[in-house]
Amino acid sequence: GKSTLPGHLLDFSIGQYDTYTPIQISQYINTIANGGSRLQPYLLKEVYESSKENKEGFGTKIYEASSKELGKVDVEEKYLNRVKEGFKAVVSYGLGTQYMGSYQSIGAGKTGTSQSFIDTNKDGVVDTETITTSFVGYAPYDDPKMSIVVISPDVADASAETTSGIDKRLSSEIVNKYFEIYK
């Protein structure tokens, strides 16, 4: 924003009024996990032909996505490592425990909560305050193999049990399943 009012400056300093897509949030966490290298995201990793001999298996690989570096964050490694240590602390013994499922000890991440407002009866008037909760993380901490972004928009029940419970259940099940498949 362009406002210089003291209250607005405080809001801006913590990211209030900023909006990001899940892909942008994913790039953010992956840039940190990758030591400051910002990589181009892709949604499809590999494509295989069907196997004629084995109905359960894969045939020949016909496509594999390649990594492309889009840029490098200009920051000293010690500062980037400090952020990573903070992310590790969040899931190890902070408010982010249980978000990494059975892999809490090897993960890193960040929780988030923001105010949101909606028009509940579609009359053009924003009439209800809600919150949007989020969790973003990666694992393993020392050699990242996966990352996750969970965003729960417009949660009406602002109790801590409800808000964090949604993201915890989703992220922990996804992380557990990932490591079950890719041991």
Predicted regions and their residues:
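Active-site beta-strand/loop architecture of penicillin-binding DD-peptidases
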Residues: 2-69, 78, 84-183
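HHCC-type zinc-binding knuckle of retroelement integrases
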Residues: 72-73
